[in-house]
């Protein structure tokens, strides 16, 4: 879907990206992570030509991106950023409709798409005519993601999209993005500096340093088979057990024949999130519900200790 072949980028005399070779598979959720100044945001911005590469080739769906008109390329890619960038004097509906209007969609088609995306992102219909300043930070970011998805792009690019949000809202939106990716099957490339966010979201994880890829692969491989000491130290030896819990879901450890009382865990939660709730509630067993909110079993604290 998106292929970097020997790509480099300089800002003045400084090489921000050096001889980069990467392949983002169609339908994958890829996450770029690394040290400050590692080149991860530059790499993302080269995909939709917000930053032009100096050498090498970047191919999108088999075509070198420089052979495509910039507007055509960007209309095939949604883009969501930390600052959100909503138009302050436009309503939620108008913001979501930005790209479909540019593409001359019919009014009826646009209205249907707004309704569809607001439902998908968990935005209540009564927010449709509100303005950005009337929304919470989490709601604003959901509108930003809805706008990025509005024209049904082939690729969704996300640059630190949840960085300014509080931890609770951030966690909820991470869970939403996992669900949306599962439902839509879109190719997503996301940049973050947050290790836990990267581990929670990524199918394909790319660790960068000084403009180069240090290691890439699935998160489990990165944690358990680090390529060198830099990778090992970046992910943290002392936190390895807890971070491994981030890669497992409650659904994989549910005892489905059992039932219990109390506030339930969602089966799509990570074991790391479940561990926090066990500690907060001081109990040994918690009930579990499925995505429809129906009881589906229990999770035992002891099972988490075995996994960690």
Swiss-Prot record:
Pfam families: ABC_tran (PF00005), CBS (PF00571). Keywords: Amino-acid transport, ATP-binding, Nucleotide-binding, Translocase, Transport. Its EC number is 7.4.2.-. It comes from the Bacteria. Induction: Expression is sigma S-dependent. Induced by both osmotic shock and entry into stationary phase. ATP binds at residues 34-41. One of its GO terms (cellular component) is membrane. It catalyses: glycine betaine(out) + ATP + H2O = glycine betaine(in) + ADP + phosphate + H(+). The complex is composed of two ATP-binding proteins (YehX), two transmembrane proteins (YehW and YehY) and a solute-binding protein (YehZ). GO terms for molecular function: ABC-type glycine betaine transporter activity; ATP binding; ATP hydrolysis activity. Belongs to the ABC transporter superfamily. This is Glycine betaine uptake system ATP-binding protein YehX. One of its GO terms (biological process) is glycine betaine transport. Residues 2-235 form the ABC transporter domain. The gene is yehX. It comes from Escherichia coli (strain K12). Part of an ABC transporter complex involved in low-affinity glycine betaine uptake. Probably responsible for energy coupling to the transport system.
């Amino acid at each position: 879907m998106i292929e970097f072949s020997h790509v480099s980028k300089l800002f003045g005399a400084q090489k921000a990206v050096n001889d980069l070779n990467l392949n983002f598979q169609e339908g994958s959720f890829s996450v770029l992570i690394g040290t400050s100044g590692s080149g991860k945001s530059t790499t993302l911005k080269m995909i939709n030509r917000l930053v032009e590469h100096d050498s090498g080739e970047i191919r999108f769906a088999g075509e070198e991106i420089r052979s495509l008109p910039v507007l055509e390329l960007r209309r095939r890619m949604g883009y969501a950023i930390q600052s959100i960038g909503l138009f302050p004097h436009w309503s939620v509906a108008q913001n979501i409709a930005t790209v479909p209007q540019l593409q001359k969609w019919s009014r009826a088609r646009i209205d249907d798409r707004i309704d569809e995306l607001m439902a998908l992102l968990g935005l209540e219909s009564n927010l449709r005519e509100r303005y950005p300043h009337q929304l919470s930070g989490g709601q604003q970011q959901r509108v930003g993601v809805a706008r990025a998805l509005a024209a049904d792009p082939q690729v969704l690019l996300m640059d630190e999209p949840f960085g300014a949000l509080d931890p609770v809202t951030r966690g909820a939106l991470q869970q939403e993005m996992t669900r949306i990716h599962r439902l839509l099957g879109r190719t997503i490339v996301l940049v973050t500096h947050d290790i836990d966010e990267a581990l929670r979201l990524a199918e394909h994880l790319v660790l960068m340093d000084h403009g180069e890829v240090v290691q890439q692969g699935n998160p489990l491989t990165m944690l358990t088979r680090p390529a060198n000491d830099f990778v090992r130290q970046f992910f943290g030896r002392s936190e390895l057990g807890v971070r491994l819990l981030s890669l497992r879901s409650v659904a994989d450890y549910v005892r489905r024949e059992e039932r219990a009382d109390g506030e339930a865990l969602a089966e799509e939660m990570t074991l790391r999130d479940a561990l926090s709730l066990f500690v907060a509630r001081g109990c040994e067993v918690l009930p579990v519900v499925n995505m429809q909110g129906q009881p589906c079993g229990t999770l035992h604290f002891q099972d988490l200790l075995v996994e960690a």
